[in-house]
Amino acid sequence: MTVIKELNFGPQHPAAHGVLRLIMQLDGETVERLDPHIGFLHRGTEKLIEHKTYLQALPYFDRLDYVSPMAQEHAYSLCVEKLLGITVPPRAQYLRVIFVEITRILNHLLNVTTHALDVGAMNPLFWMFEEREKMLSFYEKASGARFHAAYIRPGGLAADIPDGLDEEIMSFLESFTHKLDDVADVLTDNPIFKQRLVDIGKVSKREAVALGFSGPVLRASGVPWDLRKSQPYEVYESLDFAIPVGSCGDSYDRYLVRMAEMYESVKIIKQCIDKLPEGPVVVDDRKVAPPSRAEMKTSMEALIHHFKLYSEGYHVPEGETYFAVESPKGEFGVYIVSDGTNKPYRCRIRAPGFVHLQALDTLSRKHLLADVPAILGSLDIVFGEVDR
């Protein structure tokens, strides 16, 4: 006779990568059912945004998926710009793509190395945290903050990059690919690593689409869907890069896709730096973008624009729109309803991690208890965006 026992996993558990609580039903060590309990990190973000101006709402997006903040700022900024009917200057577009791809590498490095740590490989984490620190210093030099940058804003960027930062990023990338090769050497053909991930948490193409997957989790199942190619935004259309795709849809394929994406991100950043044009990084519209400090010292009108922008904000035309970007975790979308005032009437956030977490039960059934952290790590879930 089968005896089903219930086991609590989390919400404080080192393999949960956040405040995840799972109610697991086990037959011996085999998972029969898995029920995720969410909401431990709920902060009412969508409601808070309704009480802020469009500029004040921006920092909330940094705090959703706090591992890849600029990707979410990007989605929000593009959504607001679509409502305003403005296009940012070419230099701002190239710089946005550079920092969004740095964000993608930061995210994948953390996921790949902590995932390896979950299954027993410790070294890659220490090697790659040094590389992440260097990339966070690029964030800091551009925006003044290592994590919550608020750098990509509706209308452009907070500021231009300091002189020489583009060359610094380029020289870093030359050495970074060698470090990435070291991680691949340790993990990719490692028999223990493969034993823990191959055929674990398999999803077919049809199932992946039906479950609403996106990003590396979808592409690992063999679906070549990437918003940077299928619905290009900013300057992605003019860049040459491949879309890494898996074949089996298991945890090992998800690891391989993320590793390949980091190499592609390096290619994208190099192309953007080579093509980086001169020019402004904000739109020439003082209702949306602030005037320069120099201009404010000589023009009363510029000073008034600055005061109005940071006290009242700008009024966005009435309407509604949805904009999605290819964030490191998948399709991150922002839906905004504007009533013509300076604050969003409604802001709905589509977080890829929320969709992927729903599939954890399907992926884990009939696997062993020890396989659950391996599957969870392969989905790359951060609870800031899940709970919102």
Curated annotation (Swiss-Prot):
Segments crossing the lipid bilayer: none
Classification via NCBIfam families: NuoD, PRK06075.1
Biological role stated in the UniProt entry: NDH-1 shuttles electrons from NADH, via FMN and iron-sulfur (Fe-S) centers, to quinones in the respiratory chain. The immediate electron acceptor for the enzyme in this species is believed to be ubiquinone. Couples the redox reaction to proton translocation (for every two electrons transferred, four hydrogen ions are translocated across the cytoplasmic membrane), and thus conserves the redox energy in a proton gradient.
Annotated EC: 7.1.1.-
GO function term, MF aspect, one: NAD binding
Family of the protein in this entry: Belongs to the complex I 49 kDa subunit family.
Catalytic activity: a quinone + NADH + 5 H(+)(in) = a quinol + NAD(+) + 4 H(+)(out)
Membrane topology, as annotated: Peripheral membrane protein
Protein location: Cell inner membrane
Organism of origin: Neorickettsia sennetsu (strain ATCC VR-367 / Miyayama)
Source species, domain of life: Bacteria
Keywords tagged on the record: Cell inner membrane, Cell membrane, Membrane, NAD, Quinone, Translocase, Transport, Ubiquinone
Subunit structure, as described in the record: NDH-1 is composed of 14 different subunits. Subunits NuoB, C, D, E, F, and G constitute the peripheral sector of the complex.
InterPro entries: NADH_Q_OxRdtase_suD, NADH_UbQ_OxRdtase_49kDa_CS, NDH1_su_D/H, NiFe-Hase_large
Record keyword Cell membrane present: yes
A cellular component term, taken from the record's GO annotations: plasma membrane
Name listed for the protein in its UniProt record: NADH-quinone oxidoreductase subunit D
Pfam families documented for this protein: Complex1_49kDa
Top-level EC class: translocase
